[in-house]
């Protein structure tokens, strides 16, 4: 008989001896119903004796007796637990898989097994072998009845399962059927299934396949897992599982105690204040029932529960997600040691095909933000295999998912996320320590040994010193690249400061234009976070509402998104708040009337100016929507909501705009800058009236605001500040248009303020040097309004540009009066060089800018030679006056000294002739010589005794050396009328020959 004829022996044996097998099954039921020894459910491995006592005896057929060793003829059912799997049911050894001591029936000869047949091991079907199965009429008696009981049919179906063909030999299987499942024991490990191994006392090892628990009869154990690759525990369960059970029990007790204390406090508060609200009690009862069903979920925020865990769950912009992921993957070379993937060059396209597109690109000189971002991401790495920008800066409004995006992208790229908040600890030392610990250290013994990725949240709240410290860490160089110093000192310095930055840093901020981030913006990879798409956010909110049992239509969710400006965190918190209050349905009225969900954020000035000068988009009214109910609710108050809703009709579109701009301007707070922007831009808007009545009305509003602001500042009456936000509302109703306005930052106030400061400085410089006689009669205001314009006419006389020796008497007198006037008002001419390289004389201080408007025609100025002549004469006259003043002062001092000397010498009042005053140069030289000559004091020792020096006799001595050189020079100068002084050096001045007689 060929080998393929034996494929159906097992099935034929089962079908022919169905009645005998049924009797055996009934006997096995009696045996299995006997009580056995109790053991713990958590115990996963039994001894071999326990397996024998708990298992079923193996029978060869109905009349055969079990033979073999008493130590181990059969194996018991072993309960093990694995995640989402359980052990196979009670197993039964096959007779052909034990040793020779087990009885082997001579029913069918055991043929030699073929080499390897893929069909035998991999094809688990039975239909292919049904045709080849032949009944062995010589050895097997046909069953007495063709009818099969339900129990037998169930057993047939189980016997014909896939495990029936996993037996290696072709001998007939003698299986003890059970009520639940059929048992299998294998000699070799199965190929396509999980398994466990069992070794008997005689050294025989068998394998049991693991199957899923489809009926759910066995209780699943959550954290207890079976792994064939790990060693078995002596306790039967891992110690971590026992520890976790203790922690869960402790946590449950703490929660129960806190719940009990909360209920006790609430009851005391209700008794004290007498709050008996039936609705609140009903809501609390409903909430209590839900808490009993799902206790851990009630104590957690929905924002944390439904936060995205994977890249595909993100709600943010796809382009922003890809850019951040690309930048993070640039670190793979230095962090993970992976080579950078070279981007394939784009295919060459015929330039004639996109001629117009190329021409348009050539015309645009500036690159877009997308092009700049792509260039940064495609740039070459530095010689340390790091990207050009070592820090990434995510900036955008709060609640859009910036922190969530950074966490998800970092985990997706294979990093261990280390988060720190820059607003928690603002000290630079703590900031430095935490950054270095996150970027230069690694967990060695911890569970997560992945490289760290530092995420710094709210970095716009960090001081400038901390930002500078972060930049110094980012720009830190290697020891070989450090400039200056020896190699040893450089090594010590780098050892103290640390090494290079080899880990990515992601910074998150709300306002990128904070002064402290000015230096960081220049070196960081900037990513502006756009608003979330409303369609994505509405879909996610709908999924969350459905999971939590709330009913919400798309219109209400869209209105909630518009109210919160697509703030994900605010929307989810609003849903949780409403769900906690017991509301099971979210409609349009509840969204519009509730006071929650508003963002506590100030908009930028440009956004506010744009909303003031631009009409809002016309939106289609949704079903069930009532216009501006929230504004009406805020105006009427919270006491009589129903009466207020019935008393006044809904607001129209103009009233909506009124309240929206009023709320916007109130939340801004910067009234001065807002007013300046309105003043500089309202004349650029389109005016419908030809008589400019709107412009006049706007100027009246500006005047009113200026008066109110001045009253507030001068009188400290801050109650009037409530009227300042109405100016933007008036400008919106007067100048708002549908087109997008071109807003320019206000500069007129700054220019006027700088001009005023400049004029005040000119006047102060002029008045500070005016003679006291004039200053007492002329104030700054009267000088500007009355005197300066006429003074400029006085300073422009008609003089000939010739030498002063050629002036007539009248011209000399006119020049002298001009010089006296300019010196009296501290005015002169200074030479300056223009941008073209020419030299001009300008009035200093230039009071002409104070009293002359730039649009008025300039009077005929003086010529260059005339101004030069006037400037020279002013300098000479100033020197003469200074010298005369000094001489008068010195003469007065000498007279006072002489009078005091005479009074001391002649106390009786005798008059003596006054000594003539010495010349100026003589006084100077005498004073100089007096300072140069000094009396020598005798040298003394420590005890104050005079030291006598032995002077050596000079070799050659003359009588002329008795006096010192200084004294002889002083006498020579004092006794002569003319003296000379030699100046060593070179002079390029004009020289002429003179005689001594000209000097005398």
UniProtKB/Swiss-Prot annotation:
Main localization category: nucleus
Biased composition (Acidic residues): 272-295
Binding site for ATP: 396-403
Pfam families associated with the record: AAA (PF00004), RFC1 (PF08519)
GO annotation, cellular component aspect: DNA replication factor C complex; nucleus
Compositional bias annotation for Polar residues: 60-70, 888-898
Keywords: ATP-binding, Cell cycle, DNA replication, DNA-binding, Nucleotide-binding, Nucleus
Coiled-coil segments on the chain, per record: none
CDD domains attached to this UniProt entry: AAA (cd00009), HLD_clamp_RFC (cd18140)
Renumbered residue ranges of the record's region Disordered: 53-89, 130-159, 272-301, 888-916
One Gene Ontology term of the molecular function aspect: ATP hydrolysis activity
InterPro entries to which the protein is assigned, alphabetical: AAA+_ATPase, ATPase_AAA_core, CTF18-RFC_complex, DNA_replication_fac_RFC1_C, P-loop_NTPase, RFC_lid
GO biological process: DNA replication
Location(s), subcellular: Nucleus
Family the entry assigns: Belongs to the activator 1 small subunits family. CTF18 subfamily.
Subunit structure: Component of the CTF18-RFC complex, which consists of ctf18, ctf8, dcc1, rfc2, rfc3, rfc4 and rfc5. The CTF18-RFC complex associates with pcna.
Protein's job: Chromosome cohesion factor involved in sister chromatid cohesion and fidelity of chromosome transmission. Component of one of the cell nuclear antigen loader complexes, CTF18-replication factor C (CTF18-RFC), which consists of ctf18, ctf8, dcc1, rfc2, rfc3, rfc4 and rfc5. The CTF18-RFC complex binds to single-stranded and primed DNAs and has weak ATPase activity that is stimulated by the presence of primed DNA, replication protein A (RPA) and by proliferating cell nuclear antigen (pcna). The CTF18-RFC complex catalyzes the ATP-dependent loading of pcna onto primed and gapped DNA.
The name this protein goes by in its record: Chromosome transmission fidelity protein 18 homolog
């Amino acid at each position: 008989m060929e080998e393929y004829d034996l494929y159906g022996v097992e099935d034929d044996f089962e079908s022919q001896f169905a009645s005998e097998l049924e009797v055996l099954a009934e006997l096995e039921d009696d045996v299995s119903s006997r009580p056995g020894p109790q053991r713990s459910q958590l115990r996963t491995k039994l001894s071999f004796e326990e397996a024998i006592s708990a298992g079923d005896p193996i029978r060869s057929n109905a009349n055969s007796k079990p033979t073999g060793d008493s130590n181990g003829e059969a194996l018991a059912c072993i309960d093990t637990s694995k995640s989402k799997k359980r052990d196979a049911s009670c197993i039964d050894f096959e007779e052909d898989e034990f040793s020779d001591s087990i009885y082997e029936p001579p029913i069918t000869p055991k043929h030699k097994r073929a080499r390897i047949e893929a069909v035998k091991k991999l094809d688990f079907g039975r239909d292919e072998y049904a045709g080849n199965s032949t009944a062995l009429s010589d050895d097997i008696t046909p069953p007495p009845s063709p009818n099969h009981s339900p129990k037998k049919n169930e057993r047939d179906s189980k016997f014909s399962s896939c495990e029936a063909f996993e037996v290696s030999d072709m001998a007939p299987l003698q299986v003890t059927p059970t009520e639940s499942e059929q048992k299998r024991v294998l000699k070799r490990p199965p190929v396509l299934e999980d398994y466990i191994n069992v070794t008997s006392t005689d050294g025989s090892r068998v394998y049991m396949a693991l199957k899923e628990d489809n009926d759910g009869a066995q209780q699943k154990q959550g954290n207890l897992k079976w792994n064939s690759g790990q060693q078995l525990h002596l306790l039967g369960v891992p110690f971590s599982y026992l520890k976790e059970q203790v922690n869960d029990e402790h946590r449950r007790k703490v929660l129960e105690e806190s719940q009990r204390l909360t209920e006790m406090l609430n009851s005391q508060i209700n008794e004290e204040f007498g709050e008996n609200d039936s609705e609140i009690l009903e809501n609390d009862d409903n909430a209590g029932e839900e808490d009993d069903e799902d206790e851990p979920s009630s104590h957690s925020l929905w924002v944390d529960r439904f936060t995205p865990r994977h890249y595909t769950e993100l709600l943010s912009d796809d382009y922003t997600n890809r850019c951040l992921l690309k930048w993070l993957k640039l670190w793979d070379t230095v962090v993970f040691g992976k080579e950078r993937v070279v981007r394939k060059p784009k295919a060459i396209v015929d330039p004639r095909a996109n001629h117009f597109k190329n021409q348009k690109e050539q015309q645009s000189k500036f690159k877009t933000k997308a092009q700049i971002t792509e260039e940064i991401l495609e740039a070459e790495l530095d010689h340390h295999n790091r990207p050009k920008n070592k820090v990434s800066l995510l900036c955008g409004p709060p609640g859009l998912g910036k922190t969530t995006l950074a966490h998800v992208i970092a985990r997706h790229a294979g990093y261990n996320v280390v988060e720190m908040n820059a607003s928690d600890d603002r000290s630079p030392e703590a900031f430095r320590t935490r950054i270095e610990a996150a970027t230069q250290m690694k967990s060695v013994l911890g569970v997560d040994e992945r490289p760290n990725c530092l995420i710094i949240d709210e970095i716009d709240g960090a001081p400038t010193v901390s930002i500078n410290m972060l930049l110094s860490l980012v720009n830190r160089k290697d020891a070989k690249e450090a400039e200056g110093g020896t190699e040893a000192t450089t090594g010590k310095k780098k050892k103290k400061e640390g090494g290079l930055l080899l880990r990515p840093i992601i910074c998150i901020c709300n306002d990128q234009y904070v002064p402290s981030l000015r230096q960081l913006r220049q070196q960081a990879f900037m990513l502006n976070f756009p608003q979330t798409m409303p369609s994505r956010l509405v879909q996610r909110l709908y999924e969350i509402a459905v999971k939590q049992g709330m009913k919400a239509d798309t219109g209400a969710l869209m209105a909630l998104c518009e109210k919160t400006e697509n703030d994900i965190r605010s929307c989810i918190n609003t849903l949780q708040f409403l769900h906690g209050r017991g509301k099971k349905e979210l409609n349009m009225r509840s969204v519009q009337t509730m006071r929650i969900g508003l963002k506590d954020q100030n908009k930028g000035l440009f956004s506010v100016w744009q909303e003031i000068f631009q009409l809002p988009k016309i939106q289609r009214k949704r079903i069930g929507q009532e216009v501006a109910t929230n504004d009406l609710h805020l105006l009427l108050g919270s006491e009589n909501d129903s009466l207020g809703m019935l008393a006044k009709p809904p607001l129209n579109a103009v009233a909506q705009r009124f309240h929206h701009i009023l709320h916007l301007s109130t939340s801004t707070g910067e009234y001065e800058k807002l007013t300046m922007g309105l003043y500089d831009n309202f004349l650029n808007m389109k005016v419908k009236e030809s008589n400019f009545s709107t412009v006049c009305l706007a100027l009246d509003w500006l005047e009113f605001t200026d008066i109110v602001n001045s009253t507030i500042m001068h009188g400290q009456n801050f109650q009037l500040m409530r009227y300042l936000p109405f100016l933007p509302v008036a400008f919106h109703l007067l100048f708002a248009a549908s087109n997008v306005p071109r807003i320019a930052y206000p500069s007129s106030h700054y220019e006027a303020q700088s001009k005023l400061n400049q004029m005040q400085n000119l006047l102060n410089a002029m008045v500070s040097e005016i003679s006291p006689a004039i200053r007492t009669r002329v104030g700054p205001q009267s000088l500007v309004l009355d005197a300066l314009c006429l003074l400029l006419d006085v300073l422009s006389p008609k003089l000939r540009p010739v030498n002063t020796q050629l002036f007539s008497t009248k011209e000399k007198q006119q020049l002298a009066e001009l010089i006296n006037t300019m010196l009296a008002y501290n005015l002169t001419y200074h030479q300056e060089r223009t941008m073209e390289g020419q030299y001009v004389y300008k009035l200093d201080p230039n009071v002409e800018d104070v009293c002359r408007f730039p649009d008025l025609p300039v009077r005929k100025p003086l010529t260059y030679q005339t101004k030069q002549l006037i400037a020279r004469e002013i300098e000479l006259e100033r020197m003469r006056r200074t010298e005369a003043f000094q001489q008068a002062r010195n003469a007065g001092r000498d007279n006072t000294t002489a009078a005091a000397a005479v009074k001391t010498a002649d106390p009786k009042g005798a008059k003596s002739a006054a000594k003539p005053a010495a010349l100026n140069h003589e006084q100077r030289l005498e004073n100089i010589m007096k300072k140069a000559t000094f009396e020598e004091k005798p040298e003394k020792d420590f005890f104050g005794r005079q030291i006598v020096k032995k002077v050596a006799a000079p070799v050659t001595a003359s009588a002329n050396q008795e006096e010192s050189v200084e004294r002889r020079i002083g006498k020579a100068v004092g006794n002569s009328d003319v003296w000379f002084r030699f100046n060593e050096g070179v002079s390029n001045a004009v020289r002429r020959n003179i005689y001594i007689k000209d000097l005398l």
